[in-house]
């Protein structure tokens, strides 16, 4: 089980990303628009830098929904390889069967 503080920190980051997503996207569009004057683009860059660091999507770490483990994460199932193996062997994940050949 991962530290609860790390899991909670990641959840806080996810909330910040949702809260600032529209503003961040709008500022990024201004910065990337070559047709706008350089001063306006520079002001948008400064305002983008003033946003909280944790409001950037790249700061979010994919974590297992079951254990909070950050590594060995399967995006499709939102869980780690270890949790997948445990729940799969117990038959709690639909469509997952033990392989034999």
From Swiss-Prot:
Q: Is rRNA-binding among the key words of this record?
A: yes
Matching entries from SUPFAM superfamilies are given as: Glucocorticoid receptor-like (DNA-binding domain) (SSF57716)
Keyword presence, Cell wall biogenesis/degradation: no
Q: Name one GO cellular component term.
A: small ribosomal subunit
| Cystines in this chain | none
Alphabetized GO MF terms? rRNA binding; structural constituent of ribosome
GO annotations under biological process? Answer: translation
Which UniProt keyword terms apply here?
Ribonucleoprotein, Ribosomal protein, RNA-binding, rRNA-binding
Q: By its UniProt entry, which Pfam families does this protein fall under? A: Ribosomal_S14
Q: How does it assemble?
A: Part of the 30S ribosomal subunit. Contacts proteins S3 and S10.
What family is this?
Belongs to the universal ribosomal protein uS14 family.
Q: NCBIfam families, alphabetically?
A: PRK08881.1 (NF006477)
Q: What does this protein do?
A: Binds 16S rRNA, required for the assembly of 30S particles and may also be responsible for determining the conformation of the 16S rRNA at the A site.
What this protein is called in its record is: Small ribosomal subunit protein uS14
The source organism is: Brucella canis (strain ATCC 23365 / NCTC 10854 / RM-666)
The uppermost taxa in this organism's lineage are:
Bacteria, Pseudomonadati, Pseudomonadota, Alphaproteobacteria, Hyphomicrobiales
- Which gene does this sequence derive from? rpsN
